[in-house]
Amino acid sequence: MDIDQYMTDLGRRARHASRAMARASTAAKNAALEAVAVAIEREADTLRQANARDLARARDKGHDAAFIDRLTLSDKALKTMVEGLRQVAALADPIGEISNLKFRPSGIQVGQMRVPLGVIGIIYESRPNVTIDAAALCLKSGNATILRGGSEALECNTALARLIGEGLDKAGLPQEAVQVVETSDRAAVGKLITMTDYVDVIVPRGGKSLIARLMEESRVPMIKHLDGICHVYVDDRADVAKALNVCDNAKTHRYGTCNTMETLLVARGIAAHVLPALGKLYREKEVELRVDSAARAVLTEAGVAPLVDATEEDWRTEYLAPVLAVKVVDGIDDAIGHINEYGSHHTDAIVTEDHDRAMRFLREVDSASVMVNASTRFADGFEFGLGAEIGISNDKLHARGPVGLEGLTSLKYVVLGHGEGRQ
């Protein structure tokens, strides 16, 4: 297979389809989503068989249990896919909305209209559910998309692509609006991220090594995040009960997510009141604590053990595991400084009853999501009321934070006049 030609053909078809999608009605887009949901329900056995072949190859290659779990298309995952499609169909369609319409002294009206980005390339790893999640959001937001999933899920992704195409066709929309790269050749990724004539944005969903590679090589703009080094700062004016609940949930609700707390900062004035209880809670849940000298002193006196001395590297590490870095800070100045120095600009939270300090934290912490008296685990499109998300961005341009339908659109200026000319 000539990869360059194959990918160029995908791009050309996607660009053509994107023009039809930009003018597609809400009713047609919703009909396509419902048709895909029905097709998945009807072809569940076919999808399971395709997934079984993917799983067999993955096991033969020696992939670990965690990888196999991500790759598995369970009955629950199939149900979630169907529910997700219908949830996206129920979301308000942002395309065509005109906002900020203002009369100008010249007689014209100037506003902004929300429009699709165009063609979105999505690169992801072993989760077949991403194929449906991404296709649904791109479809509803009026975009065409090229999906490049992990080679280990190729059989399942190809089967899903057929069902998506069927749904688009039934709704009178071009099947080329959602295309799956049907080759495991890694050169396809290299080509996709350089096709500036056909692809408007790349959304990578995967591990740090994948994102880092794409950041170096992509010529197409990206919506992405590299790390999720999230902090909770317990202020010396915190409610202790709230602090315990927030810090417990932020770390132990799920260990392997990008919005999980990786560093706990505690104000010196409250450390003796909150750290012993937190230390015992974490040790009961077998969380390894990597502590600075001040935190070690408080925790040792409380009988919390074992403890590991933190290094400079710990403040910069996304563990994605039951490991937590703990540091005692002098106060809010120290906490904000630490977060802006070592954090990844993803999600950070303060626990405090002091309104002025809370507002200062919100203003000065340079992150995509900043929270007061709430767990970092809330940094999620569904929890934010976006209905769904295609990913989380910690960049500052275009989309920041959880990226839902609006994040897959842009604004263009529209001018309404009555024959006016500029004087």
Swiss-Prot record:
Top-rank EC class of the record's enzyme: oxidoreductase
PROSITE patterns per UniProt: PROA (PS01223)
Physiological role: Catalyzes the NADPH-dependent reduction of L-glutamate 5-phosphate into L-glutamate 5-semialdehyde and phosphate. The product spontaneously undergoes cyclization to form 1-pyrroline-5-carboxylate.
GO biological process: L-proline biosynthetic process
Catalyzed chemical reaction(s): L-glutamate 5-semialdehyde + phosphate + NADP(+) = L-glutamyl 5-phosphate + NADPH + H(+)
Known EC number: 1.2.1.41
Subcellular localization(s) per the UniProt record: Cytoplasm
Matching InterPro entries: Ald_DH/histidinol_DH, Ald_DH_C, Ald_DH_N, Aldehyde_DH_dom, G-glutamylP_reductase_CS, Glu-5-SA_DH, GPR_dom
UniProt keyword terms in alphabetical order: Amino-acid biosynthesis, Cytoplasm, NADP, Oxidoreductase, Proline biosynthesis
A GO cellular-component term linked to this record: cytoplasm
PANTHER family in the cross-refs: DELTA-1-PYRROLINE-5-CARBOXYLATE SYNTHASE (PTHR11063:SF8), GLUTAMATE SEMIALDEHYDE DEHYDROGENASE (PTHR11063)
UniProt-recorded name of the protein: Gamma-glutamyl phosphate reductase
Sequence similarity: Belongs to the gamma-glutamyl phosphate reductase family.
Gene3D superfamilies membership: Aldehyde Dehydrogenase, Chain A, domain 1, Aldehyde Dehydrogenase, Chain A, domain 2
Pathway assigned in UniProt: Amino-acid biosynthesis; L-proline biosynthesis; L-glutamate 5-semialdehyde from L-glutamate: step 2/2
NCBIfam families linked to this entry: PRK00197.1 (NF001221), proA (TIGR00407)
Gene expressing this chain: proA
GO molecular function: glutamate-5-semialdehyde dehydrogenase activity; NADP binding
